[in-house]
Amino acid sequence: MKRLVSVGPEAPEGFEDFHKGIEAAAPFVKPEHPNTNDDISLMYFTSGTTGEPKMVAHDFTYPLGHIVTGSFWHNLKESSLHLTIADTGWGKAVWGKLYGQWIAGANVFVYDHEKFTPAAILEKIQDYHVTSLCAPPTIFRFLIHEDLTKYDLSSLEYCTIAGEALNPAVFETFKKLTGIKLMEGFGQTETTLTVATMPWMEPKPGSMGLPNPQYDVDLIDNDGRSVEAGEQGQIVIRTDKGKPLGLFKEYYRDANRTHEAWNNGIYYTGDVAWNDEDGYRRR
């Protein structure tokens, strides 16, 4: 017991006075105008892998951008039980634990482990009959080194993967062991699902898939020219026709970094890829 609080008319010795605490709190000021779609609804920090972390602000249209994430990429139905392995403090959590899944009417299995162990994940899938799993490639690398014959994974129907490039060997091994193809996707804290392998597409190991139709995705060189198949280019989102659902509003209180990443009708992801002959994006 660390703190005692009294709600009575007078606080006894050793107790904090609840009513005095309320009086000392800052008063709530009702906003003059109601929220609009353009107002900030949530903020997430980037991981800071390529520099200082940035505070990414999304507006109230952001959840709608995840309709494609849940209903199509995750291939969810009302009978689905989906598990995304991601810490709640990161943007990937709302990718897989909230917006797209709820909009699809699916069930969400939340498991925030203190320490990751492959066996614990497999046990949860078995015991709770998880039907859909999304995790980074690293997780699947650990899973394929377990003896999967010890677990009943018959409920598992669909698996998606994001966060880093997928090793083709992991794809092939997991498919051999489970019969399930890993469907890769790509996006950022600043976006929703941007490039992905959808259910109606044949996955190509090592490829992210094709652009999400809600984004005008292009690959450009240092001169701003769209690259040809086989050439490397930066992944960009063209916004000259308007801001697409799911794209961030700004880096909070950082106009310079916002302009640096998003200017002249183009959002620059900073990530590099190339197109194969079928238009699939590869890293």
Locate the predicted segments by residue:
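Conserved pre-ATP/AMP-binding loop-to-beta segment of ANL
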Residues: 6-16, 23-45, 52, 75-81
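Gly/Ser/Thr-rich phosphate-binding loop
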Residues: 19-20, 103, 130-134, 144-204, ...
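Conserved S/T- and glycine-rich ATP-binding loop of Class I adenylate-forming
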Residues: 40, 46-49, 82, 125, ...
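Conserved AMP-binding A3 loop
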Residues: 41-65
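Short beta-strand->loop structural element characteristic of the AMP-binding/adenylate-forming
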Residues: 54-57, 84, 107-114, 183, ...
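Conserved AMP-binding/adenylation subdomain of ANL enzymes
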Residues: 64-81, 88-131, 146
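Active-site glycine-centered loops adjacent to acidic/histidine catalytic or metal-binding residues
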Residues: 87, 163, 187, 209, ...
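Conserved ATP-binding/catalytic segment of the ANL
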Residues: 228, 236-283
